[in-house]
UniProtKB/Swiss-Prot annotation:
This is Actin-related protein 8. Keywords: Acetylation, ATP-binding, Cell cycle, Cell division, Chromosome, DNA damage, DNA recombination, DNA repair, Mitosis, Nucleotide-binding, Nucleus, Phosphoprotein, Transcription, Transcription regulation. Component of the chromatin remodeling INO80 complex; specifically part of a complex module associated with the DBINO domain of INO80. Exists as monomers and dimers, but the dimer is most probably the biologically relevant form required for stable interactions with histones that exploits the twofold symmetry of the nucleosome core. PANTHER family: ACTIN. Residues 1-25 have a biased composition (Basic and acidic residues). It is found in: Nucleus; Chromosome. SUPFAM superfamilies: Actin-like ATPase domain.
Amino acid sequence: MTQAEKGEAENGKEKGGEKEKEQRGVKRPIVPALVPESLQEQIQSNFIVVIHPGSTTLRIGRATDTLPASVPHVIARRHKQQGQPLYKDSWLLREGLNKPESNEQRQNGLKMVDQAIWSKKMSNGTRRIPVSPEQARSYNKQMRPAILDHCSGNKWTNTSHHPEFLVGEEALYVNPLDCYNIHWPIRRGQLNIHPGPGGSLTAVLADIEVIWSHAIQKYLEIPLKDLKYYRCILLIPDIYNKQHVKELVNMILMKMGFSGIVVHQESVCATFGSGLSSTCIVDVGDQKTSVCCVEDGVSHRNTRLCLAYGGSDVSRCFYWLMQRAGFPYRECQLTNKMDCLLLQHLKETFCHLDQDISGLQDHEFQIRHPDSPALLYQFRLGDEKLQAPMALFYPATFGIVGQKMTTLQHRSQGDPEDPHDEQYLLATQSKQEQSAKATADRKSASKPIGFEGDLRGQSSDLPERLHSQEVDLGPSQGDCLMAGNDSEEALTALMSRKTAISLFEGKALGLDKAILHSIDCCSSDETKKKMYSSILVVGGGLMFHKAQEFLQHRILNKMPPSFRRIIENVDVITRPKDMDPRLIAWKGGAVLACLDTTQELWIYQREWQRFGVRMLRERAAFVW
């Protein structure tokens, strides 16, 4: 080494030492500055997979794809032993339908629907003439099917090679006589945890992993061994279960083997997909409806609520109304997968929200069940086509009794792996406040003998007050922090708030009332004004003719008069940029993949392995 080279090396060491000294006093982040080399590379969108899991449909595709693949989110698993009892998750049926009060509630809901239909005039200024189901029943009872073909053209899935599992369309078309259990791993937007077979968290995650892996291989043509070169964007509900999200992230990174992940909320992604910056998002899915207000890429926590009904409830309600009108296909069963598919199709074909369509109309439909003849039925329907979708605004018509129908954003239960969750922060914050108050009390207390008794009384009372506070911090829904002598009042306030929440969540809010409630929870009048001016409807549950005008009319009529005077126009958007509303959230996930700011949101496999759920707190674009 030459003298010059030695000098350069020494200078380098000195500079390095100085740099180290400068950094000694700096607070270091949880995640080290040294990150995987992949961070330095420019992310290519065709190596990013966007996953939007729904209750009935999985939407999955590369960020560069124009449209995602839409796959039924269902799996059929072969029985381990001969003679095992068959198990299948229900689709259109649900708990709370067969209670003694169900039919009475259904009838009361239908009366409210009929009253609303009659009270709103048609566009020519006249009132609709109601059509009773008896007018259609006598005609429909006489109808017999015509045989179009002795073979429907559809076949049951071939299971002669005894596959361990079948996914998507193949699972839907498994013959009920074959030895397969049917599982829908997501119900009403959450993981389908239940006490039956395949209902544990581990089993549900295993089903999801198989379905997603199959879709990636079949529709995206990506071998699973190559997932280490890919990253994933996962869309989650606005009101999410932290434990479930953590398990899904762990599955994607550690089991499926993706190199990185970004987790974001459906509502925010819907704004990205529609190109709107501030809007009230109304996501009407197949099994749940969620409403929240999004402003500049942030979902306002207080405005979030989830309603436990959706498109499949409308399908079931439509079937009940058609039965009253003498539905000619008398063999229809809600427990049959093929009949559920048929009812969904009939709802999408015939139902509408157009007040101007009145009177009896003739319709026809075909039944093409596997290994059966193709049949053609003719029948008549009147107001049933309008009554069924209106049940979204009068959910008593669904006849669901004794179920929690509305969910608000609650405080998390806490996670032992996350040392800085809300429970920890609240507990430490409260102890600091108590400690500070106790110190202040001691300082302010004077030394004369006459005051010693009072001081002793105060200090002896302090542990009780501390104890009462710590006990109260346990529940997840509490919003009150107790301090000092206010503990009893705070406890009373907390209990009354909990009671109010439980009463509110027991009610089935109509869609229009849910939107008004969400907007009313915004913090300022300016924000409320923005939200009333822009209501975006996404999801496939409200894709009815004239739905946009109908919802707009309901919101205008029910919004507070103070806002009606200052808002020029209530804009309800059902098809932004002429896009399919079912794909908008997925499209927003694809847009998110291409944003420069997303570079800071990636959680990498090695980081997750080392830091676990803390990475979600560090990197999530929303408050974890």
